[in-house]
Structures are given as structure tokens and as C-alpha cells.
């Protein structure tokens, strides 16, 4: 049994520091690096790519809405042309730094409100996928487990990694509970570990109302901006390995 462990990193910018990138990077296998629109800047992007390389962590683009003030967590209505080119632009920006450091891009994981909007809006999902395909059809799209987005991507010829969230609560329909609601973000490492093992070994988890949600697991996300990110990530890695689960990058098993 194999699974990837990912985190959203490189989200500092200018004088503002966010996340525990150096510490978390030691325990993950794939890094989703912000591309400068919802967070990140050229200096941070290159440093994060270099840090990933030093830790043998695979690099992926983490594009979002052009919303630095809102950290990409506010919905924006985009035309298909805008969505397609916004994605292409951001992947290209990260690729420049990856190439400079001798690193290949493994995947693309949309950020925040864009990630969630793609689950609800098929036209948006198709436009984002087209933007990825424009750049490189060999990239892997990281998206919500068992979502329509995954189906669309596969129909369009893009490889997919089904993602689950270690530190987020689920609705009965398999979507994430909005961050503003009580219980949406889980911080207890033991509860998180139990949920992760349930997802990986039992193929699902209990939703916030107690209903069972079936989930396919290729990659597990731990948010780097969680105050307990280091503690949680290291504990998840330890528990998975104790349970006989191999923690490896997506490229090793998504073909």
C-alpha cells in the first residue's frame, strides 16, 4: 500500500512569513508551491523549490485566484479563457524556478477557493484542466477525492491523484466543511492520525454528522499554515509507516 503526503508551502511573501516550510518539508513527499498570486513571491518560490530539492521532495504548482489580500480563499467568477490562462501563467512562473534549480514539476494542485469552485463548476474545472494540458500533459492533477473534477480530468487525458485532507472535516457529500464553521479544522494529532488510517485502510471516514464517506486516497494533505503543522505531519508519517504504508511521491505510482 502506497500513499503520498503533501503540503501547501511557499506561502510567505515580502516581509510576511507563513508556515513551517523547512520543518514540514522533512516529512512530506510532495510540495505544492504557491505561484505568487494568492501567496508567495519570486524569492520565496525559488527558495522553496531549492528546499524541496534538498529534501528529495517532489515539486508541484499551487495556483490560485489573483487574490493576495484574501489569500485565495475568496471566490471569483472567471471566464473559461481567464481560468485557462491564469493557470498556465502561474505554472509557467514556478517552472522557471524549477528549471533554474534542475527540478521537474510533478503535479498541479489548485488552491483554496479555486480548488473548491472546480468541484461545483464543471466549466471552470475544464478550463483549469485545459490550462494544465496546454503546459504539459504529463503533469498530475491533485484534486478532491471521488469528485467530478477527477472524472473530467481523466476524460480529458490528464493523470489524477485523489486527495484527502488530514486536518479537515468532511460533509456527507465528500466536500470539505467550510473553514468558518465549528469543527472544520482538526488540530488534535491523535484524532487526525485515526482519521488518516481510516481513510487509507478502510477507504473512508466519518463526516461531521457521523455519516460514512467513501474516499479514494492517493495523497494526503496537511496544511502548512496549521499552527501544529510540524507535530501533525511528523505524527502522520510515523503512524503510516508503523501501519506498513509506504509514503512515496505521486510519480512513483500514478502512471
Curated annotation (Swiss-Prot):
UniProt keyword RNA-binding, yes or no: no
Query: One Pfam family this chain carries?
Result: LamB_YcsF
* Domain of life, source organism: Archaea
Reactions it catalyzes: 5-oxo-L-proline + ATP + 2 H2O = L-glutamate + ADP + phosphate + H(+)
Indicate the transmembrane segments per the record.
Answer: none
Which CDD domains does the entry link to?
LamB_YcsF_like
Q: What is its EC number?
A: 3.5.2.9
- SUPFAM superfamilies of this UniProt entry? Glycoside hydrolase/deacetylase
Broad enzyme group? hydrolase
Give the molecular function GO annotations: 5-oxoprolinase (ATP-hydrolyzing) activity; ATP binding
Stored InterPro entries: Glyco_hydro/deAcase_b/a-brl, LamB/YcsF/PxpA-like
Q: Which UniProt keywords apply?
A: ATP-binding, Hydrolase, Nucleotide-binding
The reply to whether Protein biosynthesis figures as a keyword in the UniProt entry is no
Report any one BP term from Gene Ontology. carbohydrate metabolic process
Biological role = Catalyzes the cleavage of 5-oxoproline to form L-glutamate coupled to the hydrolysis of ATP to ADP and inorganic phosphate.
**What does the subunit section of this Swiss-Prot or TrEMBL entry state?**
Forms a complex composed of PxpA, PxpB and PxpC.
The entry assigns this protein to a family as follows: Belongs to the LamB/PxpA family.
PANTHER family attached to this UniProt entry: 5-OXOPROLINASE SUBUNIT A, UNCHARACTERIZED PROTEIN YBGL-RELATED
NCBIfam families xrefs: PRK05406.1-3, PRK05406.1-5
Would you tell me the protein name for this molecule?
A: 5-oxoprolinase subunit A
Name its species.
Answer: Pyrococcus abyssi (strain GE5 / Orsay)
Q: Which gene encodes it?
A: pxpA
Amino acid at each position: 500500500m502506497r500513499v503520498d503526503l503533501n503540503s501547501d508551502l511557499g506561502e510567505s511573501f515580502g516581509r510576511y512569513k507563513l508556515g513551517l516550510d523547512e520543518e514540514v518539508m522533512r516529512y512530506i513527499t510532495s510540495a505544492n508551491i504557491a505561484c505568487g498570486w494568492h501567496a508567495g513571491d519570486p524569492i520565496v518560490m525559488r527558495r522553496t523549490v531549492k528546499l524541496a530539492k534538498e529534501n528529495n521532495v517532489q515539486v508541484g504548482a499551487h495556483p490560485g485566484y489573483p487574490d493576495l489580500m484574501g489569500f485565495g480563499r475568496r471566490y471569483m467568477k472567471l471566464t473559461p479563457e481567464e481560468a485557462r490562462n491564469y493557470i498556465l501563467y502561474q505554472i509557467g512562473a514556478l517552472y522557471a524556478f524549477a528549471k533554474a534549480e534542475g527540478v521537474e514539476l510533478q503535479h498541479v494542485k489548485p488552491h483554496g477557493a479555486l480548488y473548491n469552485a472546480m468541484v461545483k463548476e464543471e466549466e471552470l474545472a475544464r478550463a483549469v484542466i485545459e490550462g494544465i494540458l496546454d503546459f504539459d500533459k504529463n503533469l498530475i492533477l491533485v484534486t478532491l477525492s471521488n469528485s467530478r473534477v477527477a472524472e473530467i480530468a481523466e476524460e480529458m487525458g490528464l493523470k489524477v491523484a485523489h486527495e484527502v485532507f488530514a486536518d479537515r472535516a468532511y460533509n456527507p457529500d465528500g466536500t470539505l466543511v467550510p473553514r468558518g464553521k465549528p469543527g472544520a479544522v482538526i488540530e488534535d494529532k491523535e484524532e487526525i492520525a485515526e482519521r488518516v488510517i481510516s481513510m487509507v485502510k478502510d477507504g473512508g471516514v466519518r463526516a461531521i454528522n457521523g455519516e460514512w464517506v467513501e474516499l479514494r486516497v492517493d495523497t494526503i494533505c496537511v496544511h502548512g499554515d496549521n499552527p501544529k503543522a510540524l507535530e501533525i505531519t511528523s505524527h502522520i508519517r510515523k503512524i503510516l509507516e508503523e501501519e506498513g504504508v509506504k509514503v512515496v511521491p505521486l510519480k512513483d505510482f500514478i502512471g
